[in-house]
Amino acid sequence: MMIPSQSCFCFFFMVSFFLHTLASPTLRHCRHDQRNALLEFKHEFPRVNESNQIPYDVSLSSWNKSIDCCSWEGVTCDAISSEVISLNLSHVPLNNSLKPNSGLFKLQHLHNLTLSNCSLYGDIPSSLGNLFRLTLLDLSYNYLVGQVPPSIGNLSRLTILDLWDNKLVGQLPASIGNLTQLEYLIFSHNKFSGNIPVTFSNLTKLLVVNLYNNSFESMLPLDMSGFQNLDYFNVGENSFSGTLPKSLFTIPSLRWANLEGNMFKGPIEFRNMYSPSTRLQYLFLSQNKFDGPIPDTLSQYLNLIELDLSFNNLTGSFPTFLFTIPTLERVNLEGNHLKGPVEFGNMSSSSSLKFLNFAQNEFNGSIPESVSQYLNLEELHLSFNNFIGTIPRSISKLAKLEYFCLEDNNMVGEVPSWLWRLTMVALSNNSFNSFGESSEGLDETQVQWLDLSSNSFQGPFPHWICKLRSLEILIMSDNRFNGSIPPCLSSFMVSLTDLILRNNSLSGPLPDIFVNATKLLSLDVSRNKLDGVLPKSLIHCKAMQLLNVRSNKIKDKFPSWLGSLPSLHVLILRSNEFYGTLYQPHASIGFQSLRVIDVSHNDLIGTLPSFYFSSWREMSRLTGEDGDFRLSEAPYMGKVLNATAFFVDSMEIVNKGVETEFKRINEENKVINFSGNRFSGNIPESIGLLKELRHLNLSSNAFTGNIPQSLANLMKLEALDLSLNQLSGQIPQGLGSLSFMSTMNFSYNFLEGPVPKSTQFQGQNCSAFMENPKLNGLEEICRETDRVPNPKPQESKDLSEPEEHVINWIAAGIAYGPGVVCGLVIGHIFLSHKHECWFMEKFRRKKPKVVTRIARPSKH
């Protein structure tokens, strides 16, 4: 007979064993109807890859009848009822749409449904509303289109609704107000539009609201005080308007508020708040239309870590009061109209400061010595202001400083050598004229980016720069350096990506130092006095995208060997002494990646075979075709460093003696300029293959024969100059259909027959057709008031006196926009804070002058 204690032990053991058996999904089979519904759902996606070799989070290889469905990957069953309560197929490539009668909707007991990153497309079926027990619905990172169905309101138990990064459109349904248990609403990166429904105010349990990067408009709800649990509020990059919703900042739990990139206006006003949010840590109000002064009430947010008020219309003086906030780490005031001196005072309470950006304002006076009290400072951006004087010695005390941007000010004097320990030094467009103690401390240099362009430096090229062995980008353009380029620059060629020395007085040959320059993207030595030949070591620059040697005295055969560089997009040899033929039968034609080529005003000769342009694939590939150019690939159109900003490049046009500069070369610019040489023979018929060509200048040569009919295929052509040749025959009537062509010149040839009667032709000046006696149909074009005398044509290569009738399209080398340099690094520190794909947004900003960008959080 058992003693009582033994009986109790046996009883509890049996009960525990029974409960364990009941709860174990592996010991209890799932219901047949659940299994069949799952298999039906699986069979709706016949192209799903079930290979275990593919590193997806879940595969469907385990979904077969020989295995209990509660053990299938991604499936979770209730321990008692064996109903499927969770389905997580994240990253399984379903590659199909959700069908309205899908087996998925037979799983009536689902609580959690995660189909993120499954390559789903098509509409969200309204039958999704049948899964009324859902508490979590995640359809993020797919290609879903259409509107959110009103049946979403049936999911009244939802606490998490995530539709991030799809292609959904239209207004949100009013039924969304039925989701009264919702805590996480994530609709960012879609195309939603219209107003926020009034029923949105029912969602009082919300912790996170993320509507970032849509097209919502109108005003935000005036009263948001009902969202007492709200922690994260992100409506950035929409079209909301009106004034700042003050009630938002009375929510005591609010920690993160992002309203940037909208059309809010009026003053930034926090007054009359009974209970300011003491938890607020991140406030982003940039890229709106706020005006007036920065309110001193901001200083009441004593937990504030990051404040971004950039690119508004704020006025007033420097907001010294901000620097009383002890937790403040980042302040961005760039792109406003703030004036006066910068005065920090004795504000050591803000010792946490890591980032200060006051660029593009109207601050003046000296840079304050007191900035040195912020010992944790990593970035200091003061570009585009009116600062004067010299760089304060006290800044050298900032041991953690990495990025120092002072472009476009009125600074003078010497550049101190302690700057070389930083990562980035950008001092362009000032009046610096010397270097202090340049050789000291260079063995410990860390500088990777050095921009000394557009200052007053003169004399021989400084050899001490060769000791900056970590350099990646060196910009010394637009100064008065003379003498030769030192061969010792080879010391950092292994790391260099950009070497910009244009517009100085450098002489001698370009040194043969590029054997190890495998990372070099851009080389610009234009507008100097260089002579000799192009160094053959350039053939090792396999990454090179831009080569500009314009306006020198280089005397060499045309470098057809450059055609083997796989990434060469821009080649500018203009105004040198290159000679010989472009086409060399023994060499590969190459130049498959060229987008801009300018060999004008040289001494090139010979004929071009009819197939000459047939290998120029980049100019023949229509935008949007497979493998299309990405902005981030080309420094002349958008050079990226740390995915944070871009260079600005230019295109110049000499028209009737006036040189006009376009401030931006974008990915659509495709240019050929062969003018001012001695090419002869027919214009190659293969020119018609270059479907993307925008500007074609073959003027001032000796081309003969007819104008190729294939030119009519260049539907994107905007400018055509065939003047000063020996062309004969008729102007192809098909050219009249080129609707984008606004500028043309056929003068000084032997053309005959009728001029096309299209609007593009009839709108030209008479001078575009002069000295073609047999042309007819010019009555409307050459009215008496438009007639001009026919000057004797001159074929001089002197760029200072161009003929009035000649249009020379020039793709200039990298014309770095002032202050753009600083933008290249601002996101480097911020990437861990807001985690946005900064670069793609940068090139879609509503404000074209923006040069800085703060990164985004993990979800928008």
Swiss-Prot record:
Topology Cytoplasmic: residue spans: 831-860
Signal peptide, first to last residue: 1-23
This protein's UniProt keywords: Cell membrane, Glycoprotein, Leucine-rich repeat, Membrane, Receptor, Repeat, Signal, Transmembrane, Transmembrane helix
Highest taxon, organism lineage: Eukaryota
Glycosylation sites: 49, 64, 88, 95, 112, 117, 154, 178, 202, 213, 313, 346, 364, 429, 482, 503, 516, 642, 673, 697, 745, 765
UniProt keyword Disulfide bond, yes or no: no
Name under which the protein is recorded: Receptor-like protein 31
Source organism per UniProt: Arabidopsis thaliana (Mouse-ear cress)
Gene assigned in the entry: RLP31
